[in-house]
Regions:
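Glycan-recognition and processing domains
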Residues: 268-343, 372, 426
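Substrate-binding cleft of secreted/luminal carbohydrate-active enzymes
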Residues: 158-291
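Short, surface-exposed beta-strand/strand-loop-strand elements in extracellular ectodomains
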Residues: 362-374
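Solvent-exposed strand-to-loop "edge" motifs in beta-rich extracellular domains
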Residues: 4, 355-361, 396-398
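Aromatic-lined carbohydrate-binding surfaces of glycoside hydrolases
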Residues: 1-115, 142-151
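Extracellular carbohydrate recognition and processing domains
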Residues: 373-403
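Substrate-binding cleft/loops of secretory-pathway carbohydrate-active enzymes
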Residues: 92-199
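Extracellular beta-strand ligand-recognition surfaces/modules
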Residues: 392-425
């Protein structure tokens, strides 16, 4: 719920007001009757790298006059019965900010000490009480560990608004994200909103042509869209707002089918073999993984390849979007470990889908454990087109006998080097995974 913005002025790229507020803009969410109660106003910093630059003036939402009336409103909302309606699927708990979403990130927006923190906690507790048994549909817009700990204690989820900056929050344990010593991006499935099925969302937006000032050439937006959508799935998000359906309709359709899936009911597991050196992790952050893991070790050490340059991102300047074997140094394999809860033992009926760059004339094969000798080989001979292609292999005899991060199967280069971008395992028939996250 938005209720903080008192004034919304349009400005130029230098922050000068060019179209002052008339007091009736849709962004001006604060009730006009507050003018009679002396609520202090806060003029925020102008946002000038937006498609349409603006400057917001907010109410001081933690001032006693505002705060007391805000809590009364939320209690009345709870008594109205509206939260119990089936139509209410998710609800954002907005704060205040200089940006257009009342999303907050500064200490003034989301205080974590003193009287401000006490009032912030009162806001959260009042929302939880108003929604009662449906409090799990509430989403704080904060990513601060202290705020999230309080939300999780109350049974409230979380929503970010900026997954298009797809390498944000790489190392935020409160959101289940970490980067290990080898650079692999990890996910903690026991993070409360993931484990307990709270609303757990994000927004993937800012893809119109007016956003080139922030993100660079429009022709690069398709890459950013794809990376962002896959990052949302890596984070186990179960809610996603998108503002474009035409950049990659097939990917959007896939994401819609995947959102909210757990290890128990997901039809597939996948690994995107990407790597990006960032300012925070200059040696590189590896892979987006969803229950399928790739790891380097002796005989299976890989090289990041297929570079895509980024025009304007404040975290990094390029992405590697594939990994290859390194036959010249005796590294002929790319090894994969499937989450034991997804499939273990066997034999199982599965589909392997391997997306690769058809560069040069290498030959590679998919090697897996099968109980019967003589199974037809899963072999690919590249033809040098330079295209991105996907090889699909249907198999009904696959055993996944390894445990943990030991390899269940591998891509093996027979001639030259295999350049692999994305590997997906689809289980056929009834789901046979172990115990996953509660629904």
């Amino acid at each position: 719920m938005r209720a903080a913005v008192w004034r919304f002025d349009q400005v130029d790229r230098e922050g000068k007001v060019i179209r002052p507020s008339r007091g009736n803009a849709p962004q001006e969410s604060a009730p006009r009757w507050l003018a009679d109660h002396g609520v202090p106003l806060i003029k925020e910093k102008a946002i000038t790298n937006n498609a349409s630059p603006f400057q917001i003036t907010n109410c001081d939402i933690f001032h006693p006059i505002y705060h007391e009336r805000y809590l009364r409103f939320i209690r009345a909302l709870g008594r109205s019965g509206i939260p119990a309606l089936d139509a209410v699927k998710v609800a954002y708990l907005c704060d205040k900010s200089a940006t257009n979403g009342e999303e907050g990130w500064t200490e003034a927006d989301q205080p974590t000490s003193g009287e401000g923190w006490q009032r912030y906690r009162e806001r959260l507790a009042t929302w939880a009480e108003a929604f009662g048994p449906k409090r799990h549909v509430l989403m704080t817009v904060s990513s601060k560990p202290q705020v999230l700990a309080e939300c999780y204690r109350l049974g409230i989820g979380q929503r970010n608004g900026f997954v298009e900056m797809y390498l944000g929050h790489l190392d935020n344990a409160a959101m289940g994200q970490a980067v290990d010593a080898d650079g692999y991006l990890l996910i903690d499935d026991q993070c409360p909103p993931i484990a307990n099925g709270y609303a757990w969302g994000d927004e993937n937006e800012e893809y119109g042509r007016g956003w080139t000032a922030r993100f660079g050439p429009y022709e690069t937006f398709g890459h950013r869209y794809r990376e962002s959508m896959l990052r949302a799935l890596q984070m186990r998000r179960n809610y996603l707002l998108v503002d474009r359906s035409d950049l990659d309709p097939a990917l959007l359709h896939y994401v819609c089918l995947e959102l909210g899936r757990t290890i128990d009911d997901t039809p597939d597991a996948w690994c995107y073999l990407r790597e990006t050196p960032t300012r925070q992790f200059p040696k590189g952050v590896r892979n987006f993984e969803r229950w399928l893991h790739q790891r380097d070790r002796a005989g299976a050490r890989t090289v990041a390849v297929d570079r895509y340059d980024i025009a304007k991102q404040n975290t990094h300047s390029f992405d590697f979007t594939a990994r290859r074997t390194d036959a010249a140094t005796g590294q002929y394999k790319i090894g994969f470990a499937l989450d034991d809860r997804f499939l273990s033992g066997g034999p199982h009926r599965v589909v392997f889908k391997v997306t690769y760059r058809d560069e040069g004339r290498p030959i590679w094969r998919l090697a897996y454990d099968a109980p019967r000798a003589g199974s037809s080989p899963c072999r690919v001979e590249c033809t040098g087109t330079g295209e991105i292609r996907t090889a699909t292999f249907f198999r009904d005899d696959v055993r996944f006998g390894a445990t943990g991060l030991d390899f269940d199967f591998a891509i093996e280069a027979e001639r030259g080097d295999a350049m692999i971008k994305f590997v997906r395992v689809i289980r056929l028939g009834a789901a046979t995974g172990g115990q996953g996250s509660p629904k």
